[in-house]
């Protein structure tokens, strides 16, 4: 009677490996979250540190720019440094313009990467395009690496676009320019993928993307792309923007496609605020998937928005504190307390919805609103277990959460 998201689109499964770590994109695998560094890749230590931060935040693949000989030479050192730190997240090399040369001249770089990103719009010009694209595919075959053929409308193959514009002009009923652009993106991606297959790369080694900046543009392109091929698909706006605008745009575009069963891996291309951690894009990607019920990454905190009954900021401060605490604990809890990522915590501001929401969560607290009895009942698995009062409600509630996690999700509990 009631429906959720559409069944997942069937696609080829692409395995991305490093050591004992396997991340599968597509097939029956969950939708993956990936990210990209913004360090100078030639700075091996700085890049390794940021990769570690992104991996600890939950990024399952991390892309790094490989744009110069110095960057290519640093990749093996980055991989070695990460392995020493116990960080086995696969690295994706992002190549533009000179990737065919860097993969040829720096074989250790080619081997240290787990996946290559190729942009068919700038792999070469004119007659050189086919040979330089072929060289990159041959490197992927030689080193047994999957590739993402990533088309961007900001760097689209201009020869292809010009030819399609000419063909469109000769139609009895020409398409709108926007439709020609969509078709050029799709033809560039699928045509390049089919050429890679002709060169010997398996379909289970290819991921496709067609990135644009507009929400409706992305949805239109991916709906058609998904209909016309069986390759695994990487979703993301090419530039989402800063702050709430970037988050809203990414959520709208990616959420619409995921709801239709389209998409196998996502990257949220947020412009970080000055001084803000790069890990924000990972958190947003995870929260999109978790909010849609597609995956679970960390306990969810439900909190009311507040109203005239909640003139105190206590519930807001407590919700933020608990949410931050849960996120900070997840790198450890993920391995020690399997299943904790599905836990729900409610922090409510008054008696209207507080007790009801708290009973529906694994753990909930209903703080007193304006004029209410200054007491905060705590509910665990639907039952009222305690009433907190005084100045230390936050500390006491955090301890209750911590004790519940250890008791409910600890290895001993899991075995019983």
From Swiss-Prot:
KW Iron-sulfur (keyword) present: yes
Binding-site list for [4Fe-4S] cluster: 304, 307, 350, 357
Gene Ontology molecular functions: 4 iron, 4 sulfur cluster binding; 4-hydroxy-3-methylbut-2-en-1-yl diphosphate synthase activity (ferredoxin); 4-hydroxy-3-methylbut-2-enyl-diphosphate synthase activity (flavodoxin); iron ion binding
Broadest EC class assigned to this enzyme: oxidoreductase
Taxonomic superkingdom: Bacteria
Cofactor(s) required for function per UniProt: [4Fe-4S] cluster
EC number: 1.17.7.3
Reactions this protein catalyses: (2E)-4-hydroxy-3-methylbut-2-enyl diphosphate + oxidized [flavodoxin] + H2O + 2 H(+) = 2-C-methyl-D-erythritol 2,4-cyclic diphosphate + reduced [flavodoxin]
Entry keyword set: 4Fe-4S, Iron, Iron-sulfur, Isoprene biosynthesis, Metal-binding, Oxidoreductase
GO biological processes: isopentenyl diphosphate biosynthetic process, methylerythritol 4-phosphate pathway; terpenoid biosynthetic process
Cofactor binding mode and count: Binds 1 [4Fe-4S] cluster.
Pathway listed: Isoprenoid biosynthesis; isopentenyl diphosphate biosynthesis via DXP pathway; isopentenyl diphosphate from 1-deoxy-D-xylulose 5-phosphate: step 5/6
Family membership: Belongs to the IspG family.
Main function: Converts 2C-methyl-D-erythritol 2,4-cyclodiphosphate (ME-2,4cPP) into 1-hydroxy-2-methyl-2-(E)-butenyl 4-diphosphate.
HAMAP family, sorted: IspG
Record-given protein name: 4-hydroxy-3-methylbut-2-en-1-yl diphosphate synthase (flavodoxin)
Organism field: Burkholderia pseudomallei (strain K96243)
Gene: ispG
């Amino acid at each position: 009677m009631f429906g959720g998201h559409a069944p997942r689109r069937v696609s080829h499964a692409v395995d991305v490996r490093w050591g004992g770590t396997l991340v599968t994109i597509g097939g029956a695998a969950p939708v993956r979250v990936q990210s990209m560094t913004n360090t100078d890749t030639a700075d091996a230590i700085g890049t390794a540190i940021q990769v570690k931060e992104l991996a600890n935040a939950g990024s399952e693949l991390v892309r790094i720019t490989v744009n110069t000989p110095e960057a290519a030479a640093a990749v093996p050192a980055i991989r070695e440094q990460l392995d020493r730190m116990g960080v086995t997240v696969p690295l994706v090399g992002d190549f533009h313009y000179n990737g065919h040369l860097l993969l040829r001249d720096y074989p250790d770089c080619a081997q240290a990467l787990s996946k290559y990103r190729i942009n068919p719009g700038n792999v070469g010009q004119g007659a050189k395009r086919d040979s330089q694209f072929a060289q990159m595919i041959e490197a992927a075959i030689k080193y047994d690496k999957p590739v993402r053929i990533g088309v961007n409308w900001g760097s689209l193959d201009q020869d292809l676009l010009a030819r399609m514009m000419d063909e469109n002009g000769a139609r009895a009923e020409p398409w709108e320019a926007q439709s020609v652009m969509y078709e050029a993106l799709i033809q560039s991606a699928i045509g390049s993928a089919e050429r890679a297959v002709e060169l010997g790369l398996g379909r289970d080694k290819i991921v496709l993307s067609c990135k644009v900046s507009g929400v409706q543009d992305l949805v239109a392109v991916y709906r058609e792309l998904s209909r016309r091929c069986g390759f695994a698909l990487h979703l993301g706006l090419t530039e989402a923007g800063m702050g709430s605008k970037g988050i809203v745009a990414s959520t709208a575009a990616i959420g619409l496609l995921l709801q239709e069963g389209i998409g196998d891996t996502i990257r949220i291309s947020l412009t970080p605020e000055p001084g803000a951690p790069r890990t924000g894009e990972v958190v947003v990607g995870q929260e999109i998937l978790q909010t849609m019920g597609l995956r679970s990454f960390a306990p969810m905190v439900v909190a009311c928005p507040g109203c005239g009954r909640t003139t105190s900021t206590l519930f807001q401060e407590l919700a933020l504190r608990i949410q931050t605490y849960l996120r900070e604990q997840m790198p450890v809890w993920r391995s020690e307390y399997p299943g904790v990522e599905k836990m729900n915590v409610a922090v409510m501001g008054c008696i209207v919805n507080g007790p009801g929401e708290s009973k529906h969560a694994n753990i909930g607290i209903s703080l007193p609103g304006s004029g209410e009895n200054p007491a905060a009942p705590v509910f665990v698995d639907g039952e009222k277990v305690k009433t907190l009062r005084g100045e230390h409600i936050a500390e006491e509630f955090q301890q209750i959460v911590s004790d519940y996690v250890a008791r409910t999700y600890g290895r001993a509990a899991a075995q019983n």
